């Protein structure tokens, strides 16, 4: 995760000339200025006349607040605020929900400071080996320890490629595992070998709905089927493309499992991880897996798994890292259709993208020609039915959506990607409403999710990144306040050359929500440096 680090600027006093009315402004940080504009005005943007022409700018909120100006920390000397509609000097405050694309600065200068390595999805979670290292060991016929999420089974499995199984490997697995040796296989291979599920999925009462088939032993080359050599023989037979249904006795001592198509991207289980690793290693899609037990026979947890792996020179990888690895490389969406759509902000071209994994349809609103794909203004917006459609005042989602479209229209070129399935930061509409009830009872948005046993933010941006790339974007100015989104998109190889903040108006209804996002989730709703505090979040709008 990237760190939040705001560099400091020395304040300087400058003057805004506005039709015989001079107002003072303090230069703050990278195009943000504290400014006093005494009255109200319906505009959300205005222009500043300079010696070199006219540039767009915006005032955030109301009196004594923030003005955003494209020239970074350059003082606005001899500039005039111009009403864009009348070309006349502006005599009133200009209220905006954010800044224009021209107001962006290089991303590190805007507070999202992270080492380049922080964006590399191939880097393992601290304390784990990398996925490429595990893939190489699988390719060589070695065992790997695969660990799932602590909120799932929180267990580790010994995993290897089935086609490389040996009696020695089986003896090691049986000695350190539960003794229940499983072989994960794709549906086509199970059907070819006539291996039906033990119970249909509707009747499956196993905690994680693991899809067990009938058990088997190889008919040829085995005795009782239980020895390490017999089990290796059975596993090699299951992995063989030449095997036939009549080559197996039923029941037996090996437990075939049905792999979920899509692998760990559809189900974050050891069954799927074992096949995914063998496929990534260039081997046949059949994996061996067995749960590791502690010395007392209980399931081994992560500290013991690390100790065990170190003693036996085994790599330990997490399914979460495997998911990230695959999302970076697999094709996740396909373009379905496109049409021109006139909007309240102006004409856009809408592109529908369909998820290959789950069929969810997403939309990209494109303004102008992407051309060489350089320096494109981009907003990746997560679906929020209550805010975007019904205008809920609990959040600032609808305001950010409208502001993003407005800014893209004003810029004349840009992309807004609307990701569905992100409702409530990924928890879904029903859970979001339950969380609202807890918030009404005193919890904040983070505490409410945690009390419901749900992740604070489970959104993933691989689909958005692939849509952006498919549209031809190569470098972008990202409209966001969220460092997780910045890192999430950067991790998919997209070059982010600037960040454009989206600073929403504060209301009584959303103040606590925005404050929580700022203090607990790192959102950039306030700027603090060298004793001079600019905290929009602390000045509650009375409107």
Curated annotation (Swiss-Prot):
Transit peptide: 1-56
InterPro entries xrefs: DHBP_synth_RibB-like_a/b_dom (IPR017945), DHBP_synthase_RibB (IPR000422), GTP_cyclohydro_II (IPR032677), RibA (IPR000926), RibA-like_sf (IPR036144), Riboflavin_synth_RibBA (IPR016299)
Reactions listed under catalytic activity: D-ribulose 5-phosphate = (2S)-2-hydroxy-3-oxobutyl phosphate + formate + H(+); GTP + 4 H2O = 2,5-diamino-6-hydroxy-4-(5-phosphoribosylamino)-pyrimidine + formate + 2 phosphate + 3 H(+)
Swiss-Prot/TrEMBL site (Essential for DHBP synthase activity) positions: 253, 291
Residues the entry annotates as binding Zn(2+): 384, 395, 397
Organism superkingdom: Eukaryota
Record localization: Plastid, Chloroplast
One Pfam family per UniProt: GTP_cyclohydro2
GO terms of molecular function: 3,4-dihydroxy-2-butanone-4-phosphate synthase activity; GTP binding; GTP cyclohydrolase II activity; metal ion binding
Residues given in the record as GTP binding sites: 379-383, 400, 423-425, 445, 480, 485
UniProt region (DHBP synthase), positions on chain: 57-328
Cofactor names: Mg(2+); Mn(2+); Zn(2+)
Enzyme Commission number(s) from the entry: 4.1.99.12, 3.5.4.25
UniProt binding sites for Mg(2+) 1: 153
Family classification: In the N-terminal section; belongs to the DHBP synthase family. In the C-terminal section; belongs to the GTP cyclohydrolase II family.
Function: Involved in riboflavin biosynthesis. Catalyzes both the conversion of D-ribulose 5-phosphate to formate and 3,4-dihydroxy-2-butanone 4-phosphate and the conversion of GTP to 2,5-diamino-6-ribosylamino-4(3H)-pyrimidinone 5'-phosphate (DARP), formate and pyrophosphate. RIBA2 and RIBA3 together are not able to complement the loss of function of RIBA1.
Protein name per the record: Bifunctional riboflavin biosynthesis protein RIBA 1, chloroplastic
């Amino acid at each position: 995760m990237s760190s939040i680090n705001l560099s400091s600027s020395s304040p300087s006093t400058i003057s805004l000339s506005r039709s015989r009315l001079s107002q003072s402004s303090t230069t703050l940080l990278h195009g943000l200025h504290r400014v006093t504009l005494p009255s109200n005005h319906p505009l959300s943007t205005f222009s500043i006349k300079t010696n070199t022409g006219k540039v767009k700018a915006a005032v955030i909120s109301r009196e004594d607040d923030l003005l955003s100006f494209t020239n970074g920390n350059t003082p606005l000397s001899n500039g005039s605020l111009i009403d864009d509609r009348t070309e006349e000097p502006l005599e009133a405050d200009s209220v905006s929900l954010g800044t224009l694309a021209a107001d962006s600065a290089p991303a590190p200068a805007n507070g999202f400071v992270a080492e380049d390595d922080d964006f590399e999805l191939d880097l393992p979670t601290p304390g784990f080996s990398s996925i490429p290292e595990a893939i190489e060991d699988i390719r060589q016929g070695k065992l790997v320890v695969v660990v799932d999420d602590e909120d799932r089974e929180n267990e580790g499995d010994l995993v290897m490629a089935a086609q490389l199984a040996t009696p020695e490997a089986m003896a090691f697995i049986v000695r350190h595992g539960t003794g229940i040796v499983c072989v994960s296989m794709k549906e086509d291979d199970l059907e070819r070998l006539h291996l039906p599920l033990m119970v249909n999925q509707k009747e499956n009462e196993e905690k994680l709905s693991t899809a067990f088939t009938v058990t088997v032993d190889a008919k040829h080359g085995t005795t009782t089927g239980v020895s390490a050599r017999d089990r290796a023989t059975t596993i090699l037979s299951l992995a063989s493309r030449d095997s036939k249904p009549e080559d197996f006795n039923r029941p037996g001592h090996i437990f075939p499992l049905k792999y979920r198509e899509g692998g760990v991207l559809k189900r974050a289980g050891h069954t799927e991880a074992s096949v995914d690793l063998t496929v990534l290693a260039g081997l046949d899609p059949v994996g061996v897996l067995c749960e590791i037990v502690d010395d007392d026979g209980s399931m081994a947890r992560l500290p013991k798994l690390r100790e065990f792996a170190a003693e036996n020179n085994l790599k330990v990888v997490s399914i979460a890292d495997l998911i990230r690895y695959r999302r970076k490389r697999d094709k996740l969406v396909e373009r379905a259709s496109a049409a021109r759509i006139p909007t309240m902000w102006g004409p856009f071209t809408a592109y529908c993208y369909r998820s290959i994994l789950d069929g969810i349809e997403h939309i990209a609103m494109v303004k102008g020609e992407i051309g060489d794909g350089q320096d494109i203004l981009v907003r990746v917006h997560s679906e929020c039915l209550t805010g975007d459609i019904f205008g809920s005042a609990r959040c600032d989602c609808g305001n950010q959506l409208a502001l993003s479209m407005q800014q893209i229209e004003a810029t004349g070129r840009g992309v807004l990607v609307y990701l569905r399935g992100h409702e409530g930061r990924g928890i879904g509409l029903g859970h979001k409403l339950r969380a609202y009830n807890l918030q009404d009872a005193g919890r904040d948005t983070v505490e409410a999710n945690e009390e419901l046993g749900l992740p604070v933010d489970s959104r993933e941006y691989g689909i958005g990144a692939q849509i952006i790339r498919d549209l031809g974007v190569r470098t972008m100015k990202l409209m966001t306040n969220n460092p997780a989104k910045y890192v999430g998109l950067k991790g998919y190889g997209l070059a982010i050359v600037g960040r454009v903040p989206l600073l929403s108006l504060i209301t009584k209804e959303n103040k606590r929500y925005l404050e929580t996002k700022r203090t607990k989730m790192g959102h950039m709703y306030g700027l603090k440096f060298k004793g001079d505090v600019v905290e929009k979040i602390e000045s509650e709008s009375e409107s």
